[in-house]
Amino acid sequence: MRMPEHLQRLIEPVVTGLGYELAGIEFDARARVLRVYIDHPQGIGLDDCSKVSYQLSGMLDVEDPIPGQYQLEISSPGLDRPLFTLEHFKRFTGRRVRLQTLRSLDGQRRFKGEIAGVRGDVIDLEDDNGLHAIPFDLIDKARLIPEFDI
């Protein structure tokens, strides 16, 4: 899942300028919702989201990158963090992920397994059926599967 580049160019400098990492951007055209995921080594709280929302709202009102009205949502990536970049897949190698591809690969579009590694622009995903080499450009959506110690 890629971040919309035109939005990333506008949003990332604001988010990083406030001391946060831009973890991802999603725009749901049907619901008219722009979701911006932010992260920080010390975690994200409501005050962090409010601060980023205030700064982004002003900039987005001026730049007007999305025609019409929409709702802006700022949040942490959460336990089931979406993965947007190759760097995200590298960072979370060894973790379990659920992903969907744009078209069928190895006879399926939905995968659930462990990120075994990243080679160039290919994600190696291991599941019960073996190792799948999934080109990054074919990934539509990907999210970590939360792990709980019981």
UniProtKB/Swiss-Prot annotation:
Paired cysteines (S-S): none
Signal peptide positions (record): none
Subcellular location, principal: cytoplasm
Pfam families attached to this UniProt entry: DUF150_C (PF17384), RimP_N (PF02576)
Keyword annotations: Cytoplasm, Ribosome biogenesis
Subcellular location: Cytoplasm
CDD domains (alphabetical): YlxS_C
InterPro entries listed in its UniProt record: Ribosome_maturation_RimP (IPR003728), RimP_C (IPR028998), RimP_C_sf (IPR036847), RimP_N (IPR028989), RimP_N_sf (IPR035956)
Cellular component aspect of the GO annotation: cytosol
Biological processes, Gene Ontology terms: ribosomal small subunit assembly; translation
Domain of life, per lineage: Bacteria
Membership in a protein family: Belongs to the RimP family.
Function according to Swiss-Prot or TrEMBL: Required for maturation of 30S ribosomal subunits.
UniProt protein name: Ribosome maturation factor RimP
Species in which this protein is naturally found: Methylococcus capsulatus (strain ATCC 33009 / NCIMB 11132 / Bath)
Gene from which this protein is expressed: rimP
